[in-house]
Structures are given as C-alpha cells and as structure tokens.
Amino acid sequence: FTPESRLKLFEKWIKYQSIPANIDIEFGGDNEEQVNSLNFVTQAFIISIMLMAALLVTQFNNFYQMTIILSAVVLSTAGVMLGLLIFDQVFSALLTGIGIVSLAGIVVNNNIILIDSFNVISSKSNEDVRTRIIKACAQRLRPIFLTSLTTMLGLIPLALNYSIDPIAREIAYDSNASTSWAPLAQCIIYGISFSAILTLVLTPCLLVLPDHIKEIISKYRKPSFA
C-alpha cells in the first residue's frame, strides 16, 4: 500500500460521511509533501523543456524540426499515464514525476538521431522526401530499438521489485529499496517503450507533412492566366 492509495480510499469514505459544514478537513504529512514535490517536479519539467527547445533550435536552425523532436516528450508522458492505467498503479508525485522529467531527456534522443539522419541524407540527395525518410528510418531502426530495449531490460528487475546485492550475493524481492524506487523504473519503461514505437511512425509522418501540404495547395490552386 502507498500513501496515495490510502488517501484516495479515505477521501471516498469522507464523501459518504455526514460532516458539519463548519468543519474543514485538510490532509498533511505525506500528502502535503506530495503536493510540494509535484510543484517542484512540474517546474523542473518546464525548465528542462525550455532548455532543450533553445538548444535544439540553435542546433537544427529549424523550429518545426525542434517541435517534432519535443513531440517525443508528449508521447513518453502519454505512455507513462497509459501504463499506470493499464496496470492499475498509483501516480507517485515524486518518483513518477522524476521519471517523466528524466524521460524528457532520454526519449528525444531517438528523434534527434532520426531527424539528423534525414537532414544528412537530404543534403546529399535530391530524391523524393518520402524516399529520404524511408532511408533514414531504415538506417536508424536498429539503433533506436537497441538503445530503447537495453534501457528497458536494465530496469526490469527494479520495476518488478527485485533488488540485487552483489556484495552479500543476495536477490531480494519487495525490499524497502526496490519498493521505493520501483515507480521510477516503471515510469521510464512505460515511457520509452511507448515513445520508441510511435517515434518511428509519427516522426516520419510529421517530416513529410510540409511537402504533403504543399502538394495539396499546388493541386487545388487555380492556374493563373496572363
């Protein structure tokens, strides 16, 4: 049991109680710490996004590609929420929040690798944009999957509440250390797995979108007569 799950049950119980209107109920202790932690993590998340956006704009000199790269952060956050929902797990303001902030710096690497390969191919080739995107995806498919897979495999023992003590030569289950850090590992696994798959689907679509829009406009634009 976690403080968050116990608090939710207690809040549901309070709703069905006949409490006088002049009595205010406030939750302190762990709940107050959770609120403060969530505020801190939210501020850290916003600052990290702003710093990454500034760095990516200066590096790629392209606002649209910067937006595509940062879309991985949205995908990873959605993956975390979806994973918590599927496995009926509680959102920890501190550990899950730290995991989301950490993911912001991890998952953008896949998009950076893919878009950088696309830019390199585009600078050396005059092929159709779809052909260039397919080549970039073919070149970076294995690196993206390998880096994501190795990260997830390394975190699986901790996510399953296993801790390994190499000095004592022991493998413990549901220990204090593993229970405390399991939400962080689970958060990163959900975010990376969801983002890695959708990156190879959504990013190529977003890269081809400007050219596709231009084709549609040129197709329906009325011809001008002298």
Task: Give a label for each model feature.
Residues 1, 32, 119, 151, ...:
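Short, glycine-/Ser/Thr-/acidic-enriched flexible segments
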Residues 1-48, 54-60, 66, 130-132:
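Extracytoplasmic/periplasmic membrane-proximal domains and adjacent transmembrane bundles
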Residues 12-15, 19, 43, 75-76, ...:
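Residue-level marker of structural boundaries
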Residues 49-50, 189:
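Core hydrophobic alpha-helical membrane-spanning segments
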Residues 54-140, 145-164, 172, 190, ...:
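Hydrophobic transmembrane alpha-helices and their membrane-interface caps
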Residues 163-179, 205-226:
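Interfacial helix-loop-helix hairpins and adjacent transmembrane helices
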Residues 180, 184-185:
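Structured binding elements
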